[in-house]
Amino acid sequence: MPPAIVILALFTAALCAVNLRTVAADGPRIYRNEWALHVEGGTAAADRLASKHGFINKGQIGSLEDHYLFVHRRTWKRSLRSSSHRHALLQREPEVRWLQQQVVKRRVKRRVKRVYSMYPWEQRVQHSSPQVNNPAQQDNLWDPHFNDEKWDKMWYLHCDRPEFACQWSDMNVEAAWKKGYTGKGVVVSILDDGSETDHPDLAGNYDPDASSDINGGTLDPTPRYEYTNENRHGTRCAGEVAAMGNNSFCSVGVAYKASIGGVRMLDGDVTDSVEAASLGLNPQHIMIYSASWGPDDDGKTVDGPANLAQKTFQAGAENGRDKLGSIFVWASGNGGRTHDSCGCDGYTNSIYTISVSSASEQGKVPWYLEPCASTLATTYSSGAPHERKVITTDLRKGCTESHTGTSASAPMAAGILALALEANPMLTWRDMQYIVVMAANPSPLDRDTESAYPRDPRKESDFVTNGAGLRVSHNFGFGLMDAGKMVELAESWRRVPEQHVCEEDPNAQQRAITKGETIVDTKTTGGCNGTDHHVKYLEHVVVEISLDHPCRGHLSIHITSPSGTRSTLLPERQFDSSSDGLKDWAFMTTHCWGEQPEGDWILEVKDLGQQNCQRYGLRTVLPVLRKWKLILYGTAEHPLYKRDEESRPHTPQTREEPTDEEECEDGDYYDRSKQRCRHCHDSCATCHGRHSGQCLSCHEGNYFVEDEGTCSEECGQGYYKDEEERKCLDCSADCLTCQVSADHCTSCDDEDGLKLFENTCVAQCSEGRYMDENDVCQDCDDSCDTCTGPDATDCVTCADEDLLQESQCVESCSSGYFQQEYECLKCHATCASCSGSRDDQCLTCSGHLELDEDTHRCITSCEDGEYGTEEGKCEDCNIICKKCNGSQADQCLECHHDTNLYDTTCVQYCGNRRYPENGECHPCHPSCLGCIGGEINQCNQCITDYEGEDHFLYQGTCHVTCPPGLYGDTTDQVCKACAPGCIACDGPADNQCTLCEEERAPTDGRCQSEGSQTDEAECAEGCHSCEEGPDICDSCDEDYYLTEDTCVRRTNCPSFTYPDDQDRECRPCHDNCEACDGPNNQNCNSCKEGFYKTPDGCSTGCPNRYYKDDTNKECKPCDSSCFTCSGPASFHCLSCADGDFLHESSCRSTCPAGFIGNAESHECVESSCEQDQYYSSETGRCEDCPYNCRACDNDGDCAECAPTYIVVDGRCRPEETCEDGEYQDRDRDTAELSCRPCHQSCKTCSGPSDTDCDSCKGDDTILDRGECITSCGPGEYMDRREKKCKACHPTCKECSDEYDDTCTACNDGFLLTDASSCEAGCPPGQFLHHGDCDSCHRECKTCDGPHHDNCLSCQPGSYLNDQQCSTHCPEGTFEETYEDDSGETVLQCRLCHVNCKTCHGEGEEDCMECANDIKYKQDGRCVTECQEGHYPDLTNECQQCWSDCETCDGPRNDQCVTCPYNYYLVLGKCLEDCPEGYYDTMRQEKECGECHPSCATCNEGGNYNCLSCPYGSKLGEGVCYPMCEEHEYYVEKTQICEECDNSCKTCRGSTAHDCLSCEAPYGYHAMKHLCTACCEEGSPENEYCCICHESTRLCITDREAEGVQFSSADSIPTNVAYIAVATFICVVIVVLFFVVFGMLQARSNGRLCWAHKYQQVPTTRYEKMNDHVNILSQEDFYNEDSLSEDEIHSIDSTRH
């Protein structure tokens, strides 16, 4: 066949293959003949099951323990139908916990496909081999001028256009390089389509342990080469991370000395197991995984990691890098053109990945960018087609200037992370995310951003400030990654507190989604407060949503945090016409980072319905929000309070502010708003603000309360003392108080039903029991799993499969109930049967209501202002509602014009962080505390952020720092004008300037003409310190309070402020207050104009049950019978509380005579009955009132009687008149009234007994609680002026009749002093406990409680140790003796140094044994690792290395780990030159590269750089061609190939000492050419073995048994019989050889009838195509561009 036809046929086949693959990806599922299984019992159990059922076990999947991949050879490798019959039996095996047939997943590389023609600067550049630099130039000092060819064009790493001032041109990478960080020691792996291992710019950094070929099942990640260069993506990404610097070739990687690996996993079928194997490759070695791929960016796909990949992400975070956590970097996506959102990508949406976005060179939004809330940060990449792109390595050892998209951003971010990880290798995966957030720079991107692509409608910056004061964007995350800032933070970073996960119960009430309308649903959370999952400071927020919709692309979904930060979870996607909805899809947002979660989270789901949907009408899908759930990730402790001031990262918005923090002394902090150092609060040793709650550490003797940031001498209730750290730590949630540890309770909370048992708080009854009325635990009913009582059948959960309905366990739900999980819940009142509890989930209706098929509601014909009752009637809404869905005040849907809707109730005042608009309360911008609108420039009051920093109001916007010429007034948080001439100041006075015009420094706070001076003066009255001038106080004397840098008396605090006694400052009142005694609205004493005083503060309107008093400007309470009123009296009611009726502006439980109560209007309406009749609802007619009753209510109870009769219990009784000293009494049997005498001590009384006095006889008696007495009871004294008995002081048991604190006897635990007062105290040997003096433990001399063994001093001969007395000191302490002030000898135990287990002193060098976590001992000190040049021996003593080694792991010369300068490390030895089989890599680090196994000597790696060949091979243009097959060697004399020794894989001779390579599992000894066993743990000392390299299986060093000799003679048998047999076999073989050789010669000469002449095989390269041999020229044969390494191997194998 002609060659042209062959090429055409192959080309057509290739196109068909591509088309078939595309159809398969877009069409139905493709199933592989592979199954992933979770098998208990390990590899042995998996192998047994595979063999039993006809599968092959391919081994463990990545790093997932007990997860295996099975293959079935009798199943189609790729099929459109699943093969469930293959694993039906397998699934029944008890060891199989889970299995799944693997499905091909469509995964695309996130490079940008060209939309314009190729530009010149996009052309790929081919290069010759790199030049070798002079070693003298390979200096450790960083040189800003690299000699790499494209360095000058790498605009994103350095400024290459000085004429433009390079304002936004780089990511501050050079700052990290200047510190000496290059990524050295950090391992990065690129998960992609492979990576060229021998690329000139990558080979020196290539790490085989970070590489694998998952697609091909080998260890070599080299890409598959084909004519389109489709598999160039991974090589390009690798170059961005770790292209070598200063090698005169191509580009420079961000981390140009990092180790780089590649994983080939995209060039084939991608399944869940393929992804898991890639993500879990060697997680203890690889530190950073970079991925620039994901689901289709087509604007319609919703997809993410499946079961195995999700487990691998979590396992990597929990166990990778020795439990520090693997770091996963992901490209956010390139679906901008299709309006895609990375919120629909489960990889970028994961909390375990760092999702990276792109920015153009101009800092603009690229046309391909996908905005979403999960993006963490941004790096530079390509923009519009005419803009410059990223330079990096390319396929076939090339270089490109056209790498694009977020594919370029993710590896660039991975390189920056490698620099930070080199600065601090102990960073956890969460530490790294914090550092990215804190260091990200929004400034280059936070501008009026015009998109770099004309079709993209986004025109403005979308940065907002969240509730923690951080700037964040859906386009760019927290901003541009800043490498210099990241390594600076990493250097001193301390680990963030442990991660807590608060998972709220789902909102499962189904809501119909209506076209053009928005569903708003609120979830209130306390952040799991009071539990072990408490989240106080947020990191990630995940919202899991399930919904149905016929056209998913019509929906937009948002979530708003309690701080007002609004995240777009899902924007409208016009190409998404799917009717699949969302099934528990997890959206994630990072925008609430640092906020506190407590409060209302608002979910908005809107059906925009603007585009036609292709799927409408194809199948019926009702648009319904089924459920949503909130999952909060974060910390219970403040993540920044955990580190010292100098190590604490600062929030990004202050990055560009001038700072002199390093110049502040201990006890001071840097005030950013005033740009100077200020004193901490007196209680703080170090701090980050001036208040008592802003401490970072405490003075000696005090304890630090982390949650509050305060210092205290004692820990309060709910805390215990950590004496070592000097901190107050939280007790367990069950403990009321505790000691020593969080769960060592000393008391319990009785209100929670807990009791103390062996220092643990336990519930009173165990599970399955309840406490009856007699406080006895009883068994629950058999139907209950748990119950509450008072009866055994009051179930909480049910046994077996029963369902809980109204506290009873039933087999199935009754009519009018529906099943939700294991509970029967009541349907809405309008539903007879239902699918949920809402009124729009009815299936059938109750009463006379009718079902609306569209809304699934049961409706009536009620008007606005009415609602339908259960009986199908229309009744009035509550008076405060205009529209409602019930009669209650919290069931409003719309309000009257003078009130606003706040959630579901109507209020006159919306409160903080909200503003009224269109009758509703809307959230302010997150930076506002109060506002007039939702925009950033509509604030009227500013927040104080979570670091305690005030924000200041200027022209409607809240600023961290006021503009020049203004200062931040902390009293009202407003920017106010400085004095004339000041451009910066601390206050309005002319002596408060900090910077003058023309940037002159002020003199004593005043701006004066140059040369003038002011004499120094002492501080003004009341000032304790005044460093900047006598009138600028930094702190005040006692009894003075600081206000605007001035000290005043407490009573002289300015208007609108109040004295804060704790901080001794005049603090601002709430904005609504005119005068106050505290900072909150509730602390107002009087209100500003337009506000009324309420119990909750000052408000523009009054709440229900209150009315406006315009005279006193306050809200006064209505009469208790009124719900709303116009005045204080009972006859001023406007509406009544539940159950009462309004009559003539009064509220009554029953209507008066002649009126009946209207149940709908709750008013009394006139009755048609006569005056002495009432309307009976039972008979439906007018009935007569009782005898002698003139008028009665509708129940027939008398309200008015005839003359001489009175009303008694609703009936008329004869009236009886009583004299003074008598009271009226009613006979219990006859109900007749009579007069009875009062007690003799009473002057008057009112009953019902004779001692119920109203007044007393005589002056020596007083009225006390209705009784006339002459003396008071125990613990009381008589106040004769007020004629009352009053309680004595709490310490007094008895007191005199004059004063409450003039004690005559004391309560237990108190002693009576000479001054007649009672003071706490107990004699020596006792302590005060619950008011009594209890004895100390017999070993204590003195003690202080709360337990008898909390000793303060010990009896003679005992040692005091941590408040305990003992005869000897425990481990970790040493004995010390001293004399106290009284001269007595004191014995105590002192703590050893933290590194010591036992010691004889407190010094580091006084250790006798080392602590458990410290292994080594050097020069008498316990150390975590031996010093350089030393290694630990078997006793863990540090010993000196061999003299040639810099570091080592043993004493011999072949146990070096690193070498001195100018030495090479080869097989554990430090050598001056590279030995045979190795070559000089010419790197700065002086490394020997290993020659290809086919070479004897070489000048570079690879099989085409040989200089000489081993025995049995021939050299041809740098390639060594073996002349024999594997297991054979070439004999020069006979020119034939002979068999190797059985131990060899390849060899140069017949003995065991002639091996060149070995079969597994043997190791190869390169010096002795020997294959031998690798030493294992427990190998006998007399056994010969070698210590092998883990991956190459090369012998690093050997161990010879004593007396064992190895020579060629070892393999020669000495037995004569053996020699005879061997000789006979040799003769037979020789005869057979000549017979066969003769026949072949005859055939080749055509002398046999079946013979054909051989065609001579040329020594040139050939290719076989369809049985036709094409001969190529010698020149083509050695052309590098036309001959790949794989092809050379093909030639070799064919030749052999």
UniProtKB/Swiss-Prot annotation:
PROSITE patterns: P_HOMO_B (PS51829), SUBTILASE (PS51892), SUBTILASE_HIS (PS00137), SUBTILASE_SER (PS00138). Residues 664-1649 are annotated as: CRM (Cys-rich motif). Residues 111-1618 are extracellular. Residues 111-488 are annotated as: Catalytic. Residues 167-487 form the Peptidase S8 domain. Residues 1640-1696 are cytoplasmic. Glycans are attached at N246, N529, N885. GO terms for cellular component: extracellular region; Golgi membrane; plasma membrane; trans-Golgi network. The record marks R110, R111 as: Cleavage. The keyword Glycoprotein applies. Residues 495-638 form the P/Homo B domain. InterPro entries: EGF-like_dom, Furin_repeat, Galactose-bd-like_sf, Growth_fac_rcpt_cys_sf, Kexin/furin, P_dom, Peptidase_S8/S53_dom, Peptidase_S8/S53_dom_sf. Pfam families: P_proprotein, Peptidase_S8, S8_pro-domain. Residues 643-657 have a biased composition (Basic and acidic residues). The active site is at D192 (charge relay system), H233 (charge relay system), S407 (charge relay system). Serine endoprotease that processes various proproteins by cleavage at paired basic amino acids, recognizing the RXXX[KR]R consensus motif. Likely functions in the constitutive and regulated secretory pathways. The propeptide domain acts as an intramolecular chaperone assisting the folding of the zymogen within the endoplasmic reticulum. This is Proprotein convertase subtilisin/kexin type 5. It comes from Branchiostoma californiense. The gene is PC6.
